[in-house]
């Protein structure tokens, strides 16, 4: 562990107090470590990450999602330290940083390889492609009426949905927007994709969990022009009814550092019993 990168979300740590604390904690363990810092992913890309042994992300889950797309093809593992709101992906809380870093240097951790998702569509003569860790969401614009979406799975017609949109998520993303729209919680190491209609007009419209090798094609009725595509809730692009959106499992994987098998503890504490306004959580 000789080269460590730290990507800090400056809106969460504007005075760099947490960043300096992390640097000091690392130097207390090994003074010879070379530490490079990045603010909001500036300067941190695939080429840069190849020189790093680990990327420490200081922020929340959104910072991890942003970092993940920035270093898309990189195999450098990410360690998330939560100074955000929820911190489901960012497993390490700030009060346990020193213990976590000691485990990191002793090699007492595992690396989880998380599936990513990819969407493609044609724009003129160009093929547009976007990858994400959580989800791809196709939804109507603010001024738009309820829209109709025709869904094909492996080129076979599956169903038509009329509603606000459609969420296609990885198992990692199942606890994000998908869960808010009534989709299922899926263990993050399951090799699947999940399709969830958003607020469909038809009560019988439900999520479907698919083999990750599935190719999902979605077309919008041509009379709807005000539609958008969202990747991880952070990248937005406008699409129209003449385009077919294709979604499938990405060839890239995101490597996340984990110190214990505490998935169900984290799920219970941060998702199930963290629902605001519900004393008993979401279940």
From Swiss-Prot:
InterPro entries the UniProt entry points to: ATP-NAD_kinase_N, ATP-NAD_kinase_PpnK-typ_C, NAD/diacylglycerol_kinase_sf, NADK
Transcription regulation listed as a keyword: no
Top-level division of the source organism's lineage: Bacteria
Catalytic activity, reaction form: NAD(+) + ATP = ADP + NADP(+) + H(+)
HAMAP family from the UniProt entry: NAD_kinase (MF_00361)
GO annotation (BP), single: NADP biosynthetic process
Pfam families the record matches: NAD_kinase, NAD_kinase_C
GO CC term (a single one): cytoplasm
Native source species: Clostridium kluyveri (strain ATCC 8527 / DSM 555 / NBRC 12016 / NCIMB 10680 / K1)
Origin organism lineage: Bacteria, Bacillati, Bacillota, Clostridia, Eubacteriales
Cofactor(s) essential for the protein: a divalent metal cation
Gene Ontology terms, MF aspect: ATP binding; metal ion binding; NAD binding; NAD+ kinase activity
Residues at the catalytic site: 61 (proton acceptor)
Keywords: ATP-binding, Cytoplasm, Kinase, NAD, NADP, Nucleotide-binding, Transferase
EC class of the enzyme, as a word: transferase
Name this polypeptide is given: NAD kinase
Listed EC numbers: 2.7.1.23
Function of the molecule: Involved in the regulation of the intracellular balance of NAD and NADP, and is a key enzyme in the biosynthesis of NADP. Catalyzes specifically the phosphorylation on 2'-hydroxyl of the adenosine moiety of NAD to yield NADP.
Keyword NADP: yes
Positions of disulphide bridges: none
Protein family (similarity comment): Belongs to the NAD kinase family.
Positions of NAD(+) binding: 61-62, 134-135, 145, 164, 175-180, 234
Protein's cellular compartments: Cytoplasm
């Amino acid at each position: 562990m000789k080269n460590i990168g730290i990507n800090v979300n400056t809106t969460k740590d504007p005075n760099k107090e947490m960043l300096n604390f992390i640097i000091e904690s690392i130097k207390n363990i090994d003074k010879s470590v070379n530490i490079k810092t990045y603010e909001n992913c500036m300067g941190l890309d695939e080429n840069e990450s190849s020189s790093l042994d680990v990327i420490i992300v200081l922020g929340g889950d959104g910072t991890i999602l942003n970092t993940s797309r920035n270093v898309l093809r990189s195999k450098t593992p990410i360690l998330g330290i939560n100074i955000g709101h929820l911190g489901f992906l960012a497993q390490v809380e700030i009060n346990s940083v020193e213990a976590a870093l000691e485990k990191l240097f002793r090699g007492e951790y595992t690396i989880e390889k998380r599936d990513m998702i990819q969407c493609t569509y044609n724009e003129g003569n160009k093929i547009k492609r976007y990858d994400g860790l959580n989800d791809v969401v196709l939804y109507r614009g603010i001024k738009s009426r309820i829209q109709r979406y025709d869904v094909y799975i492996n080129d076979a017609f599956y169903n038509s949905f009329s509603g606000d949109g459609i969420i296609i998520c990885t198992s990692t993303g199942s606890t994000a927007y998908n869960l808010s729209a009534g989709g299922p919680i899926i263990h993050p190491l399951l090799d699947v994709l999940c399709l969830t209609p958003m607020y469909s007009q038809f009560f019988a419209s439900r999520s479907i969990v698919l083999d990750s090798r599935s190719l999902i094609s979605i077309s919008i009725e041509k009379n709807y022009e005000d539609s958008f595509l969202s990747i991880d809730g952070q990248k937005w692009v406008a699409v129209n009814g003449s385009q077919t959106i294709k979604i499938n499992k990405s060839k890239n994987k995101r490597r996340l550092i984990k110190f214990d098998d505490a998935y169900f503890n984290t799920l219970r504490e941060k998702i199930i019993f963290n629902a605001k306004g519900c004393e008993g959580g979401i279940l």
